[in-house]
Design a protein with these regions (language model features):
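Residues that cap or delimit alpha-helices
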Residues: 10-13, 102-103
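Acidic/histidine-rich alpha-helical segments that form the ligand environment
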Residues: 70-111, 121-136
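Hydrophobic core segments within long, regular secondary-structure runs in both alpha-
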Residues: 3-6, 46, 88-91, 95
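Short, contiguous alpha-helical
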Residues: 3, 12-69, 112-166
Length: 166
């Protein structure tokens, strides 16, 4: 569903905000734009699939680490093509992680400083990860539907495709 929303988004909506932030909001306004929400979703999917601590993780180029430092923003909106390539890479990473998942890896404790010292297992982190992707895919799909994007582009996806774009 995330891929459907990404592919279906027309150029005029790519930099539109899904919500308006209050003037005292601490995050830059682009954090509410379609392209950024897509990036945000993929960034966290990638990080959580790695199970790595943040200091051991870096998103692939051209992406930068903006999520925990709102003062650092991308110099430009990422393109649909860049984000589609990132989506394809994270899908491959997801497949690899799931097919290689062992009981030991599933139980491995994962901690992040922003999680307020609430360590979780790698498997629980992946369940959270799935909910997070689903939440933002639904937001993006709703936004597109509100802007009269044809329903066929936003159909429910009952099962993952074998390959992105297929």
């Amino acid at each position: 569903m995330l891929e459907n929303a990404l592919v279906a988004c027309p150029a005029p909506l790519w930099t539109q905000r899904l919500w308006s932030a209050p003037s005292d909001h601490s995050l830059p306004p682009e954090f509410a734009e379609f392209w950024y929400i897509t990036y945000h979703t993929l960034f966290w999917l990638d990080l959580y699939l790695s199970g790595s601590r943040e200091e051991e993780f870096a998103p692939p180029a051209p992406f930068i680490w903006t999520e925990l430092d709102p003062a650092v923003s991308p110099e430009r909106p990422y393109t649909k093509e860049e984000l589609h390539a990132y989506l394809a890479a994270t899908r491959q990473k997801c497949d690899a992680q799931l097919f290689a998942l062992t009981d030991e890896r599933a139980r491995q404790v994962v901690e992040y400083p922003w999680a307020e010292e609430q360590a979780v297992s790698f498997l629980e982190l992946q369940l959270y990860n799935m909910r997070h992707v689903q939440e933002h895919a639904a937001q993006l799909s709703l936004f597109l539907g509100q802007h009269a994007i044809p329903d066929a582009a936003l159909d429910w996806v009952p099962r993952a495709k074998d390959e992105p774009g297929s």
